[in-house]
Amino acid sequence: TKDSTRIYVYLEKKNSNTFDGFVGFSNNETKKITLNGYLDLKLENILVSGETLSLYWKTDGNDQKTFKASIELPYLFKTPIGLKTQIQVFRQDTTFQNTKTAIDLSYFANYNTRFYLGYQGTESSDIQNLNSNLISDFNNSFITTSFDFTKPETNNLTFPIKSKLFASIGIGKRKINTLSEKSEKNQFLLNIQATHTFYLNKKNSIYINSQNNYLKSNHYITNELFRFGGFNSVRGFAENSLQAYFVSLLLTEYRYIISPNLYLHTILDYSLFKNEIENTAITKNLTGIGIGMGLQTKNGLLRLAIANGHAKKQQFEIYNTIIHISYNVKF
């Protein structure tokens, strides 16, 4: 008819899968060849059901090895209910190995907001069978509840997320077996992470990332503590080189956009954490200062950061400077 209108919509698939990693070989102290590197892979909607599959592997060839895998299946049976499972293995040289498993039921309030109710447990093995007061075999289990909110930044490939909030609490128990103690203790777990980008104008912005973890227990052992430090934590320190039962991180960047594909930024990271030594809580402060850049290429985002980490009242030393490199490819 004269008044009829036809609308044609052509949908083009958007790349949402990401890959980041490298593999290298080096000689250790015994002149043997060791494998080092990392792999960070995230696949989304490959089965056209909205699922997310993540794989992470990292080794420094000597002290630490980490493996993580998770899968999330949303909208089961066409309902807002989903399922998420994950496994994480962390090995510290010949000292201990932790294996953590978790399963969560999720409720999708909307595309950006999710609620979780789940269970997680960790089994830790004292590889050298020392069973001391510092490192020991243990098992823990927690009932957890979580909240996840993400606000995307549309039409921005370099900074696709404007705001993100994740909060999780867990209540559970830990069983340990040492030479001096065989007991079961109640524990409380708290994890809060929040990020936000404040846009001053088209070229200037401030990025803030707050990461907070707390484990409440009557007694702590080394192989259950949180580990932090590195590119996605307080920069200027080696990956997972720090440990604590309480840690609060504030990571900040002032960003200046030179062109649509290139930006420079400052680095100012602050860390407050607590450890327990001989039943006495010790509080420490760390600072990471540096500069960085990001380059949006055809295939992904290349990031380079140079940061120097030092403790409070510690003199600045140039040899503490660490270079962090990341290339996140989308396909």
Name these PLM-found stretches.
Residues 77-79, 111, 139-142, 223-236:
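Surface-exposed loop/turn segments flanking beta-strands in extracellular/periplasmic regions
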Residues 44, 74, 102-104, 120, ...:
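Subset of outer-membrane beta-barrel
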Residues 1, 57-59, 87-91, 310:
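Conserved short loop/turn motifs at secondary-structure junctions
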Residues 16-18, 81-220, 273-276:
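Transmembrane beta-strand segments of outer-membrane beta-barrel domains in Gram-negative
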Residues 36-40, 54-56, 68-70, 164-331:
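C-terminal transmembrane beta-barrel domains of outer membrane proteins
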Residues 14-16, 46-48, 76-78, 108-112, ...:
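Outer-membrane beta-barrel channels and translocator barrels
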Residues 1-81, 150-159, 244-248, 256-258, ...:
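Outer-membrane beta-barrel initiation region
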